[in-house]
């Protein structure tokens, strides 16, 4: 799989691995690279079958396959311990890594992820799937921003969206690859195994996320033995893009928590799950 390493190059620097959502591209994390790179060695990658990681996704593909592919890649680079930050599908890959490779994941941030697929998320996925199958790639790509970004942000960024649309159509991962990856995501159910994941985990969400209702993140955190949750009031599903300054601050506060650099205060809520108060 294609990957890039940026940020700190000191042997003593800790590593943070960034995993995108269904689109799969490491380029999704561009707004985070500078902030994270001041403190960490940063690894971004294109998930198998997407972007610059060409390949055909096999039938029966699962999140466990996605996690094992990444674990093997990192092991080949002698990277044995790392923080992991994943957006939606990427967060689910992180949960699977923490379950099947617990010795590798030091801290996990799962952004707009869930214990089991919510009915609203399922509805959105079915609409997107129908668009792809019945109207084609261009219609699928054109509709995608509606699920990712707040309406006012969409209005202010028309030119950027038009440019991205051209690129996304040109580099589309392929209908069969996307549908098999989507099927793996929709079928994932972590409810029975979350109590066994002891990795410190932050479930981060945006209250205006259309695709994944924000209570999914709270439910995820509450099922984890060392789960914490944080909410952003604005940004939509892709708040790492639309509200990157606040997002980066929360991310760094959590990842640097044990270093004394973090600035956000943590307080326990009534469910004994920590919530970051913004």
UniProtKB/Swiss-Prot annotation:
**What's the protein here called?**
Putative carbamate hydrolase RutD
What is the reaction catalyzed?
Answer: carbamate + 2 H(+) = NH4(+) + CO2
Give any single GO term for biological process: uracil catabolic process
Q: Tell me which EC number(s) this protein carries.
A: 3.5.1.-
Is-annotated flag, keyword Hydrolase? Answer: yes
Q: Which Gene3D superfamilies match?
A: alpha/beta hydrolase
* Keyword line: Hydrolase
Which purpose does this protein serve, as stated in its record? Answer: Involved in pyrimidine catabolism. May facilitate the hydrolysis of carbamate, a reaction that can also occur spontaneously.
The keyword S-adenosyl-L-methionine appears for this protein: no
What is its EC class? hydrolase
């Amino acid at each position: 799989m294609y990957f890039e390493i940026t940020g700190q190059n000191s042997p003593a620097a800790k590593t943070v691995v960034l995993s995108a959502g269904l689109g799969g591209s490491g380029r999704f994390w561009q707004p985070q690279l500078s902030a994270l790179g001041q403190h960490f060695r940063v690894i971004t990658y294109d998930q198998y079958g997407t972007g610059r990681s060409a390949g055909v996704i096999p039938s029966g593909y699962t999140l466990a396959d996605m996690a094992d592919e990444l674990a093997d890649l990192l092991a080949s680079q002698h990277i044995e311990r790392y923080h992991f930050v994943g957006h939606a599908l990427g967060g689910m890959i992180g949960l699977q890594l923490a379950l099947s490779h617990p010795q590798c994941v030091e801290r996990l941030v799962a952004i707009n992820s869930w214990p089991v697929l919510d009915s609203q998320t399922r509805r959105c996925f079915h609409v997107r799937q129908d668009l792809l199958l019945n109207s084609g790639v261009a219609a699928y790509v054109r509709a995608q921003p509606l699920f990712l970004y707040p309406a006012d942000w969409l209005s202010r960024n028309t030119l950027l969206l038009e440019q991205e649309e051209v690129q996304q159509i040109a580099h589309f991962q392929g209908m069969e690859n996307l549908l098999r990856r989507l099927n793996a995501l929709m079928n994932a159910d972590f409810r029975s195994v979350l109590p066994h994941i002891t990795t410190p985990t932050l479930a981060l969400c945006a209250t205006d996320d259309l695709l994944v209702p924000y209570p999914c993140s709270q439910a995820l955190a509450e099922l984890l033995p060392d789960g914490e949750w944080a909410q952003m009031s604005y940004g939509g599903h892709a708040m790492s893009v639309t509200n990157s300054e606040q997002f980066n601050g929360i991310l760094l506060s959590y990842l640097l928590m044990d270093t004394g650099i973090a600035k956000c205060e943590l307080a326990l809520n009534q469910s004994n799950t920590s919530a970051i108060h913004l």
